[in-house]
Structures are given as C-alpha cells and as structure tokens.
C-alpha cells in the first residue's frame, strides 16, 4: 500500500515562516527525520520526496501552486501513483484551534481552509486524513489574510514549534502502525 502525506503552504522565501505554512514546516521536519530530500517534479507542480517506511512506499509532497490551488497538484499525483484518497494525509494550518494545538480528522468539509477546499474539489472527495495545526484567530483589528500571512510573535513561536513536533510525532506513529483511527485516539 502506498501513502502520501501532503504539507500545505505557499512557496517562496516571502512565505516561509508564515502561519499559513505550518503544513510545509511540519512536512520539512518529517522529511528530515525520515532522512529524505525533496526534488522538484515540474509536471506535478510540487516538491516530492519518497521513501519506504515499514515496507510501504511513502510520498511526501509540497505543492508549489500556492495554497488556494493545492488540489491542482495533489489530485494528479494521487492518480499517477494510483493512491486511494483514504491513504492521503494533508497537514495544514487551522485558524479554529489555539496556536500549537494539533487535531487529526479522517474526513469532513474544508472548515474554510482554502487549501483543503481545493484538495476536496480536485480530488473529488472529502474522505482523506487531515492533521490540523492550530494558528489561532487574528487579534482584534487584523484581517484573516494578514493573520495567516504573518509570522508568529515571540510568545507564540515556541508553542507553534511544539505543535509542529506533535504533528510530526503523530505522522511517525501513523506510519509505524498504519491505522489513522488509532493515531487519532492517541494524539487528539
């Protein structure tokens, strides 16, 4: 069985440390811990790393399409590698959770997250796993766009990093046992 873990974010140095790039940050850490490197796959508009974990093929994917078009990269990769959407996990930022809180879900709506909305649209299904990493709501007077495209202030930086570590621990646990429900029970 082949699995794919996608980290959502925006490409480029300008966005590297923004809240919207929590998925990229978590996937970068997971790739480092699995000792794999990303390479650009231009036909799929993505950075892709691959390895085997417990005898199963694993693809790590960072779409280069910008957040709101993530599905345009994810859907063709799933089709090309013949991966069922139930074996897809998407890591992303979550406005509705406090900074650093990690929540795992097996399916559902986008919850207003435009990258997830794009994946749902292009994959044609809501039945894929999600790892939501909390970034909190905007402070009074700040727009959602400005909030997600800003970095973490000093008081939240460490809490956000802890969330990334927890998300990666959850993915390593999932890759070891292959059971997302069991992973949800342990990490939610």
Curated annotation (Swiss-Prot):
State whether it acts alone or in a complex, and with which partners, per the record.
Monomer.
Q: Which GO terms describe its biological process?
A: protein quality control for misfolded or incompletely synthesized proteins; rescue of stalled ribosome
**Is Metal-binding one of the keywords?**
no
UniProt name for this protein: Peptidyl-tRNA hydrolase
Q: Per UniProt, where does tRNA bind?
A: 15, 66, 68, 114
Task: Fetch the PANTHER family from UniProt.
Answer: PEPTIDYL-TRNA HYDROLASE (PTHR17224:SF1)
What gene name does this entry carry? Answer: pth
Q: Which branch of life, at top level?
A: Bacteria
Keyword Cytoplasm among record annotations: yes
* Sites marked Stabilizes the basic form of H active site to accept a proton: 93
Q: Please give the catalytic activity noted in the UniProt record.
A: an N-acyl-L-alpha-aminoacyl-tRNA + H2O = an N-acyl-L-amino acid + a tRNA + H(+)
Q: Which CDD domains match?
A: PTH (cd00462)
What Enzyme Commission number(s) does the record list for this chain? 3.1.1.29
Q: Which family does it belong to?
A: Belongs to the PTH family.
Q: Which GO terms describe its cellular component?
A: cytoplasm
Q: What does this protein do?
A: Hydrolyzes ribosome-free peptidyl-tRNAs (with 1 or more amino acids incorporated), which drop off the ribosome during protein synthesis, or as a result of ribosome stalling. Catalyzes the release of premature peptidyl moieties from peptidyl-tRNA molecules trapped in stalled 50S ribosomal subunits, and thus maintains levels of free tRNAs and 50S ribosomes.
Keyword entries, A-Z:
Cytoplasm, Hydrolase, RNA-binding, tRNA-binding
**MF terms (GO), sorted A to Z:** peptidyl-tRNA hydrolase activity; tRNA binding
Q: Where is the active site?
A: 20
One Pfam short name? Pept_tRNA_hydro
Where in the chain is the site Discriminates between blocked and unblocked aminoacyl-tRNA? Answer: 10
Per the UniProt record, the source organism is: Lactococcus lactis subsp. cremoris (strain MG1363)
Q: Which SUPFAM superfamilies match?
A: Peptidyl-tRNA hydrolase-like
Q: Main EC class of this protein? A: hydrolase
> Cellular location of this protein?
Cytoplasm
Intrachain S-S bonds = none
